[in-house]
């Protein structure tokens, strides 16, 4: 996995009251709690989920 480009994603806003599809995107990225940070591989699929819920996230290049 070291040769793959990673992106650090942090959940900074709550998913309470959000659309079910947006909650699913957050879960798909591996985020469960606020202020939790995960490193995800930079793929078009993950970028699509990040773009869909970008208003809930903080994204940094790893």
UniProtKB/Swiss-Prot annotation:
GO terms under biological process: translation
Gene Ontology CC entries for this record: cytosolic large ribosomal subunit
Keywords: Ribonucleoprotein, Ribosomal protein
Entry's Gene Ontology molecular function annotations: structural constituent of ribosome
CDD domains tied to this protein: Ribosomal_L30
Record-linked Gene3D superfamilies: Ribosomal protein L30, ferredoxin-like fold domain
Signal peptide: none
Family membership noted in the UniProt record: Belongs to the universal ribosomal protein uL30 family.
Alphabetized PANTHER family for the sequence: LARGE RIBOSOMAL SUBUNIT PROTEIN UL30M, MITOCHONDRIAL RIBOSOMAL PROTEIN L30
Protein name per the record: Large ribosomal subunit protein uL30
């Amino acid at each position: 996995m070291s040769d793959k480009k990673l992106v650090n994603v942090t959940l900074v806003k709550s998913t309470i009251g959000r659309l079910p599809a947006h909650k699913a995107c957050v879960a798909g990225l591996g985020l469960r709690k606020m202020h939790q940070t995960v490193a995800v591989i930079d793929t078009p699929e993950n970028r699509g989920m990040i773009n869909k819920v970008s208003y809930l996230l903080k994204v940094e290049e790893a």
